[in-house]
Amino acid sequence: MIDKLMSRRRLFEAAAGALLLSGCSSQDESSTKKVKKQGKIKKAESSDGDKHLRDKDELYEVYDDSGIVTMYLTVSRGNSSENTDHSWAEINAYSVYDYADMGVTRYQVMGLLQPGDVDGPVAGEVGYGEEAPNATVQVRGQTSSMNSQKNYKVELKKGKGTWRQQRAIALNKHMGEGMRFRNKMAYDLIRGIPQMMGLRTQFVHLWVCDQTEKSNDTFEDYGLFTQVEQLNKTALKAHGLDKNGHLYKVNSFDFHRYEDTIKLADDPDYNQTNFEGMLEIKGDSDHTKLIEMLDALNDESQKIDDVLDTYFDTENLVYWMAFQILTGNCDTQNRNCYLYSPLNSKTWYILDWDNDGMLRKLELSLKGFSDYASWERGVSNYWGNVLFNRALRSKAFRSELDRAVKDLRSYLTEARLSKMIKHYREVTESLVFAAPDIDNLPVTKDQYEQIAAAIPSEIEENYKSYCESFKKPMPFFIGVPQIDNGKLRINWDASYDFEARDIRYTVELARDYAIKDVLFKAEDVLLPEVTCDAPDAGQYFVRVRATNSDGYTQDAFDYYVTDDGKHYGMKCFYVQDGGKVVEDTYEEG
């Protein structure tokens, strides 16, 4: 029995050995076959040093934004907790300044938003088939809130759906702009500029049914609006940016340190209202990084090129600036843009916002209104901003700016702009020249035709202004005159010349802003101060101009405002009984 077991064991071992040898033989044979050598894996280089922002082109291809979308908005009263227990008449009656005077937040109403076509709401769109409100509605904007035709913000409530992945729907009337298509035109142009970040836009025909006062099922025509994507966390994410980053809407900020206002949120003296008067918080509320950047920027001992390398992307700055200069969008010295920085980055970027003031040179001229002239053309427009004042003193920055300006000049051709204007007119004119918009249009039909024909050539005019601005001295501020021992002392900041040319000043004191009734005049003044006999009590104007050795003249930053616009280069002041001098001030609207 033992012999049989041993015999079976030997047989099993022999079989196992044979299988093992067979396996080894097979492995040896396969290992001798030639295997094609694989090439080295190609890996992308680290992007840590690449600070440039790039928009998502495919984002603009999802929807056709070339025509007009019809929107139906039914407004109704809500509740006091949400501040929606108001009438539609109240919503349209008050401006942001009225709310400030009343000490209350902007009134809202409930709304049912239903996008559709000329026949009504369309299936598949937000709000279709619904009867209960899905949104809140309020007037938006600052100075525009004083207009008879308002801009609206329609905020879709959470869980009520979105329109094109957006909950905040901003509808802009652009009442003061005669063409009514400039803002969309700007963003359509930005789509073709890789170095700039844009936003999605759409022409909208709005109809409103007011149910806040009584039962009603009739929609009233509110005319043409331009919907512009709201720059918020949702938009940051959609455009491939950091939704957790820092985002500020620049309301009135020229990059001075402003230590009394720009503080950390946990500072005992922090006042958010004052802070947001300068920079409206739209993202992360930790201002540490902002303050670090401002400290460095306002530290004259730090080289500006080093500051720019550390805290900014020069490409972003020069292309944003070049676009504003060439399009003549002058009201961007210290507002009408956003400041953005990814959460874990030191780099800050300027993002474009509000372009309805662009390409308006002829339109303003036809209205007989003086604005966006003198130093507001070319690089001098940004000289009062600490960031650009310091940056423009750098030859390297000026060289990059010049390359960007020339690049965009070759893109913003008359042919391109003419083609775009032709399309916008075909899409919008039927609404622009019909009620209710025709009743508030600031230009006549003939003027509209003149402006449309002239817009494409304004790019070249603005380019010439840009080139000439480097030849002139830079603008400067006039101080408040002082009276001492019967003498009036007038001083001002020194002007600056990019080529260090000799600068002399002309000073005039007059009783009128036309500077015809002149009391005192000094020419070829070398130092930024003069004295003259103190005038009697009354209103006076002092005008100071700087002229360099090449004969180019620049006005002071100061200006006097009348119904006809700005009168550049002068400061208005009053001498009261007893010799006290009171400065005339003007708040930008």
Task: Report the location of each language-model feature.
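Extracellular fibronectin type III
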Residues: 550-582
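Short beta-strand segments within Ig-like beta-sandwich modules, predominantly Fibronectin type-III
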Residues: 520-526
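N-terminal secretory signal peptides
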Residues: 1-6, 14-21, 31-33
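Beta-strand-rich modules
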Residues: 535-553
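Internal "kinase-insert"/substrate-recognition segments embedded within catalytic cores
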Residues: 174, 196-199, 215-322, 328
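Middle-to-C-terminal accessory/interaction subdomains
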Residues: 79-81, 147, 283-291, 295-333, ...
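Conserved NTP-binding catalytic cores of kinases and kinase-like/nucleotidyltransferase enzymes
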Residues: 34-185
